[in-house]
Amino acid sequence: MTESNQLNLAGVNRPIQIIPSVLPADWANMGACVKELEEAGVDRIQFDVMDGNFVPNLTFGPEMIAACRKYCNVPFETQLMVSQYNCETMLESYVNATKGANGEPGVVIAHAEANIHLHRVLGRIRDLGGSPSVALNPHTPFEMIKNIMDMVDHVLVMTVNPGFGGQAYIPTMLNKIREIRNFVIEKNLNVDIEVDGGIKAYWTISQCADAGANCFIAGSGMFAYPTLKEGCDDLRKVAQEAQKGNVLSEPQ
């Protein structure tokens, strides 16, 4: 029995959450897309915010995210893959754009690597009415954020290098997920563990769920399905089965 399965039997499983990234969506029809995602039964919708500086791509401004709100009531989250300057100067706009229709906090994820004043950024997200969360790139050790774990609602483990969709999953990130889950349990923290990158309804989501993650960001792994509902249902089923101990093996 793996260490993660021992933790599962201890009753520490958190509800599975399926969070599609709209990066591979048809941007010209984003309103219809987020509405369809809501009807598919997703738990949140993620907007990958890129500034061409921290990562080599440009994506969504706060106005576009806010414009999508009138098409659905699903909670939003923004992953700020931006430089420290852009994060701090645009933070209030993104926190507000991510909120629910009635001002409910949206998840706002700051990258540890981009923010030398991470404590200040996370505190400001909370003060502005958001749900502060932190992301770690594949090369970044968990040790870097242990001192701010009591400030966050979510930790996002990148299982690809950020910047573009459709990249290959990095399986060695499973050890980082296990390390974070053990820390969360040891310190009795109310923190969800997210994974992002190469997440599909087979061994990748299965092994991440077994390692201790409960929130799964899927882009091409969900949009490749004939319908978004089929993608959502398959992802959720495989992750839930892994929490029960039915874990899929990596193909050889």
Where are these regions (language model features)?
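Active-site-adjacent beta->alpha loops and helix N-cap segments on the catalytic face
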Residues: 2-9, 27-29, 53-67, 84-91, ...
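Structural motif
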Residues: 40, 71, 96-103, 128, ...
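Conserved, mostly hydrophobic/aromatic
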Residues: 30, 37, 48, 94, ...
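C-terminal helical cap(s) of enzyme catalytic domains, especially alpha/beta-barrels
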Residues: 209, 224-252
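Catalytic cores of alpha/beta
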Residues: 34, 86-97, 140-151, 198-216
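Hydrophobic faces of well-ordered beta-strands that scaffold small-molecule active sites
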Residues: 16-22, 45-47, 68, 76-80, ...
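N-terminal amphipathic alpha-helix/helix-capping segment at the start of soluble metabolic enzymes
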Residues: 1-24, 31-32, 246-252
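Glycine-rich phosphate-binding active-site loops on the catalytic face of alpha/beta enzymes
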Residues: 102-108, 113-114, 156-167, 211-232
